[in-house]
Amino acid sequence: MADLFAPAPEPSTELGRLRVLSKSAGIRVSPLILGGMSIGDAWSEILGSMSKERAFELLDAFYEAGGNFIDTANNYQNEQSEAWIGEWMVSRKLRDQIVIATKFTTDYKKYDVGGGKSANYCGNHKRSLHVSVRDSLRKLQTDWIDILYVHWWDYMSSIEEVMDSLHILVQQARSSIWVCLIRLPGLFLRQITTLNLMVKPLLASIKVNGTC
């Protein structure tokens, strides 16, 4: 009975000292997120890459050290990143222990169907969101995405379409509520606020530098 109220053991590393994601999102995440851009070997000639065996070793080491927060995107390593992370989670039976962040907007099918035939696999519009999330769920072998990033603003899709589509997605429970906008121009953020189109219960506007 005493064990019922015993404190959790000290983590083996500081990576395991989890913290609350934000004031509006109580999920606990590791202080560092593992970036998945180099998980895969399709981009070996232009960016970092690794074999599936080495990728699994990296993911194992990250989890064993206490990490639970993994970032990827629909297009990383021509879709290998999401697929390998999904395969790893299934093989280790760890989906419920991992917080997954992925992204849509970038054309993730050009390598497969060819340039000029993949226009609706990219951008911020409703169709792009639908097919990207559908395929990310399949590759990650999961029923939900914890955090979904709008990877970049396409300056063509309307704010109304984007925000309405994201809101519907959250209501369908395909994303665990948290939707983040990366590189959102200040003008659009002001318009979203004015139009009261905030995705509920949380919309975070995040400005980042460089490629992610």
Curated annotation (Swiss-Prot):
Keywords: Oxidoreductase. Gene3D superfamilies: NADP-dependent oxidoreductase domain (3.20.20.100). Its EC number is 1.1.1.-. It is an enzyme of class 1 (oxidoreductase). GO terms for molecular function: oxidoreductase activity. Pfam families: Aldo_ket_red. The active site is at Y76. The keyword Transmembrane helix does not apply. Belongs to the aldo/keto reductase family. Aldo/keto reductase 2 subfamily. This is Putative aryl-alcohol dehydrogenase AAD6. It comes from Saccharomyces cerevisiae (strain ATCC 204508 / S288c) (Baker's yeast). The lineage of its organism: Eukaryota, Fungi, Dikarya, Ascomycota, Saccharomycotina.
